[in-house]
Amino acid sequence: MLLAQALEKRGDDERAFSEYQNLLLLYPQNVDFEEVQARQFDIATRFLSGQRYKLWGRIPLYRSMSKTTAMFQNIVNIGPFSSVAPEAQMNIGQAWVKKARGFQISQNERHKNYRHAVEAFSKVADKYHDRPEIAAEGLFAAAAAYQRQSLDSEYDQGVTEKAIDSYSDFIALYPNEEKVAAAREQIKAMKVEQARGSLKIARYYEKKGKLAGANVYYNEVKDLAPGTDYAEVALQKIAELQPKLDSLRQSGAAPE
């Protein structure tokens, strides 16, 4: 214990974390388990907050959310129900989000990091379901991670549906949580964005003369975002298209 404390005191946090880990693995009966995990949690949190990893334990060099997630994962693995474990599991997700929002060599890599974040947050909601406050926090964070991932216009917009579903689950399971209003606002914002996309598709179909297809998407717009400018445009278009569609049907031609 003295070696780990000395390393931490002089700022060699990475080695200190490893020494604390060795104590828990090799001498679990001879140390205060909760105290050691608390020290590890504080060290990992410093790295999560932006502290740099050091070269030779002395020269601050780089930040690494991958190494930070591994630290928090070690805490959870060895003490899944310790006092710091739920927050450590949350911080695994936060570290993946930070990594996703940093420089990435490809979109696929960024989306993979968001998926890791969702998995970490979802584990909070599942593993600690008997602690509503932390479980609610995990579910809300999972929804937010899905939402961030959906902001990439080139990515599968099915992720938006997953975000909406997760926020909806949060509202249904934790109706008294303070963030319910925020969840509703995020759902509304995402549906408006979906409506904008559907309106573009509807206009494309209409321009190509595929009136039935355009009508389907205009109806989708009005259902997704009632009361918005998008819905008003869609309702006007539906009214304009209906006589044309009726005329095509009466003539025996199947509208596209």
PLM region spans:
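Acidic, polar-rich low-complexity tracts and alpha-helical solenoid repeat scaffolds
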Residues: 1-256
